[in-house]
Amino acid sequence: MTRPELRDDVRIVDTTLRDGSHAQSHQFTESQVRDTVRALDGAGVEVIEVTHGDGLGGSTFNYGFSRISDLELVQVAADTAEQAKIAVLLVPGIGTADDLRKAADRGAEVVRIATHCTEADVSLQHFEIARDLGMQTCGFLMMAHRTTPEELARQARLMVDAGCQVPYVTDSAGALLMHEAKDRFDALITEVGDDAWVGYHGHQNMSLGVANSVIAYEAGVRYIDGSLCALGAGAGNSPTELLAAIFDRMNIATGLDVMATLDAAETVVRPYLNRWPKIDRNAIVQGWVGVYSSFLLHAETAGARYGVPVHEILRRCGELGYVGGQEDMIIDVAIQLAKVSGTVSEPSASLVAG
């Protein structure tokens, strides 16, 4: 196995059309995908991720239904991109090997296979299949704050030995402080740096995604994720346009045209935003107690339904140690909090229908 060849000093991977799907309630249209891919492609972005926020197969009752299927959106993206590769996310247990094969048939050339930070073993067959399909492979070790740097590195080694070319420190909760992030970058690079690149995926819940991206590069990380307008779960991701500007100021080559990324954010993405990612009480609580960023909208729905403050739901989810895939437990938390506070109320007709 070889590492993907790097065009520049660092590769900025854009996840507007995947992580951003959480903030858009998975309602991207074909025209939005087409226009966003065209703008990112023209700005020099080399890898553009496109799927439901929870990856291939994520359009379900538990995670939220997509307006348009993943495969259709991947096809639109692949048909639009001229130089960029289209990536998909696959979470074993949500997406299947068959989903991956179909995505590759529609034009996906990169797959990012995601597991909880201590469960890399469930991804091994998926990496083997992806390599057999000729795809570039990245591995997301999600909720990276929930284990030690040493254990995270051991999990990265499992992925790399199975065919992963780029294991990621994935700060799904936006919880990592700067020294904690660096410890994890150093551990992964020491363990797998001779065999694979290391990546970083951050969230802005504690306003540290961008700072940690700079620390990541200085530590030797060479794949860094961003999202136009920070569009993503929780308080959003590190803004792609901001990463482009910062690395340009640092004389670090990204291959991105700074003005073109700014134009993409302001003239393409901003007009279709359902909500602007923001660092508010709810998002800060997610980063503070380490809650999976995509829990935010689910907690807002449950809070409105049962008359419970959203930040209290999120805080309790953190105390209980819930991880990605346990979104269904948010309702239980809201009900229990409502019982304690005496605010149990019947769901409104509109909430039941929606």
Curated annotation (Swiss-Prot):
EC number(s) on record?
4.1.3.39
List, alphabetically, the HAMAP family matched: HOA
Q: Binding positions for Mn(2+)? A: D19, H201, H203
Which controlled-vocabulary keywords does the entry list?
A: Aromatic hydrocarbons catabolism, Lyase, Manganese, Metal-binding, Plasmid
Its domain of life reads Bacteria
UniProt-listed Gene3D superfamilies:
1.10.8.60, Aldolase class I (3.20.20.70)
Its catalytic activity?
(S)-4-hydroxy-2-oxopentanoate = acetaldehyde + pyruvate
Active-site residues, record numbering mapped to chain: H22
Q: Which GO terms describe its molecular function?
A: 2-isopropylmalate synthase activity; 4-hydroxy-2-oxovalerate aldolase activity; manganese ion binding
Q: Which family does it belong to?
A: Belongs to the 4-hydroxy-2-oxovalerate aldolase family.
Entries under Pfam families matching the protein: DmpG_comm, HMGL-like
User: Residues that bind substrate, according to the entry?
Assistant: R18, D19, S172, H201, Y292
Quote the PANTHER family the UniProt record gives.
Answer: 2-ISOPROPYLMALATE SYNTHASE 1, CHLOROPLASTIC-RELATED, HOMOCITRATE SYNTHASE-RELATED
- Name assigned to this protein: 4-hydroxy-2-oxovalerate aldolase 6
According to UniProt, residues marked as the site described as Transition state stabilizer are R18
